[in-house]
Regions:
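Charged, low-cysteine interdomain linkers and short loop/connector segments
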Residues: 95-122
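Alpha-helical promoter-recognition and RNA polymerase-docking modules of transcription initiation factors
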Residues: 1-101
């Protein structure tokens, strides 16, 4: 029988690594949907950021993992309702980091401190 996210979260908060794995597994399809939607909506396939949906899913898993210790079932909220923003934000953080790295590769300073496209530096 499949355990609820809330029960698995409570066990994971007590240090049960198997419960944490099950919690991630229970929400794999949700994380995949968020990753696919974000990948398409931001046109990441054409962005040059070297990100794919697997990268976003991994970031989403980390977002879910980080939500576990902060979740309070006593507030009456479902775990996934609580974790969804953390999952999305973790994916967006990955995109922002990739974009910053992309910009860094594209721009460099010349000897006078003037920013130039990397292809003109030298």
């Amino acid at each position: 029988m499949k355990q609820t996210n809330e029960r698995l979260c409570a066990l994971a908060q007590k240090g049960d690594a198997t419960a944490l794995d099950s919690l991630i597994d229970n929400n794999k399809s949700f994380i995949g949907k968020v990753a696919n939607d974000l990948f398409r909506s931001m046109n990441l396939a054409q962005s040059g950021l070297n990100l794919d949906t697997d990268d976003l899913k991994q970031a989403g898993n980390m977002g879910l993992w980080k939500a576990v210790p902060k979740f309070d079932a006593a507030r009456g909220m479902k775990f996934l309702t609580y974790a969804a923003p953390a999952i999305h934000n973790a994916m967006m953080d990955m995109v922002r980091d990739a974009f910053a790295a992309f910009e860094q590769r594209m721009v460099t300073e010349d000897k006078d401190g003037i920013l130039l496209p990397a292809r003109f530096a030298g």
